[in-house]
Amino acid sequence: MAGPKLDGAGNAKLATLESALTQLQRVHGVVEQCAVAVKGQQPASTFVPQIRRATQPMVGLLKGQFGMISDQVASFLLAATRGGGNDHTRVRILREGVVQLRVQLELAVAKTHELHTIDDAHEGPAARGTSS
């Protein structure tokens, strides 16, 4: 059974959110690789450029339709690229940032479904197959 029908704006927003979730999975993978390296006493700084490259496109992708989430991604990027401090603390901050972004994106998907679902009652008699 197919999911609920969405209007055009809802489909566009969902496509944007799905793309952002896919990119976030890539960021999460890099963060977890960083965590494994830090656990093995290797520096986390070698993973910062990878995180930056994986995160920067998300800012532009989300800016048009989801500005507040885009600002959160930019904040995550700032926290990821900030120098100094303990590598274990950096990994913790990166993991928390990934979780926050995932929650916001999933909430945006749910809200998009809620706001852009097309009801059969609003489609008119021709769409339902009845005639007046």
Task: Describe each model-derived feature in a short phrase.
Residues 32, 39, 56-59, 63, ...:
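Alpha-helical repeat scaffolds in large eukaryotic proteins
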Residues 12-19, 39-43, 59-64:
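A ubiquitous short alpha-helical element
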Residues 34-54:
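Alpha-helical segments in soluble extracytoplasmic regions
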Residues 56-57, 74-82, 96-100:
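Hydrophobic alpha-helical segments of small multi-pass membrane proteins
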Residues 47-50, 61-79, 93:
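Short, well-ordered alpha-helical segments
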Residues 1-34, 85-132:
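Amphipathic, coiled-coil-like alpha-helical segments
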